């Protein structure tokens, strides 16, 4: 709940007036929202934040992003700030924050909309057919860049997910899919190779 409604936290050197004890924080947030007639969302997947960026020249993935949305915006902010704080914390609980990246042709008018529609379709299928039925993870959001699309995931069982995602993505031979940890400097994992790729070798 705190990630949804608290933008930032600063450490104080001494107790301040009107400070709230951590065990009382949830009740305080809930009471404040009710008092202002606001709806309470305690499931992060119920609230998505949209964002827009100016694409940058950078060798790292995601710096070409123009727009995206996320139900875990602090993780996105950590990535661009070069921080692994949230990534490491999630990893400490056995969860793996990752994203799927797939390049697309962006040469003609309408290419961006076409791949964006495809990304939405793929996100829906991933959630309904892979992530939710067996509790493999959560869909966190996605983004579109100038030449690459991204789908953001939080995996609870990465090995089981990997077993299922490869045959799943073979339904889309027109794209090349890669998996990366949700942090800068990560290695890319090619999720599968087409027959054309193998013949080129």
What are these regions (language model features)?
Residues 1-38:
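Terminal low-complexity, intrinsically disordered regions
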Residues 20, 24, 28, 32, ...:
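C-terminal structured domains
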């Amino acid at each position: 709940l705190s990630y949804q409604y608290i933008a930032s936290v600063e450490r104080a050197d001494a107790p301040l007036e009107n400070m709230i004890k951590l065990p009382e924080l949830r009740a305080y947030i809930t009471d404040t929202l009710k008092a202002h007639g606001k709806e309470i969302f305690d499931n992060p997947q119920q609230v998505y934040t949209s964002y827009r960026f100016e694409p940058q020249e950078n060798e790292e993935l995601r710096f070409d992003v123009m727009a995206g949305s996320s139900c875990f915006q602090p993780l996105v902010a950590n990535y661009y700030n070069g921080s692994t704080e949230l990534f490491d914390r999630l990893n400490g609980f056995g969860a793996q924050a990752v994203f799927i990246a797939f390049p697309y042709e962006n040469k003609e008018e309408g290419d961006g909309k076409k791949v964006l529609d495809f990304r939405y379709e793929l996100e829906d299928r991933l959630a309904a057919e892979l992530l939710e039925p067996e509790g493999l993870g959560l869909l966190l959001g996605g983004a579109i860049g100038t030449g690459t699309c991204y789908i953001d995931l939080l995996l609870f069982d990465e090995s089981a997910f990997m077993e299922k995602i490869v045959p799943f993505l073979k339904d889309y031979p027109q794209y090349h899919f890669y998996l990366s940890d949700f942090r800068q400097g990560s290695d890319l994992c090619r999720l599968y190779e087409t027959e054309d790729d193998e013949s080129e070798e």
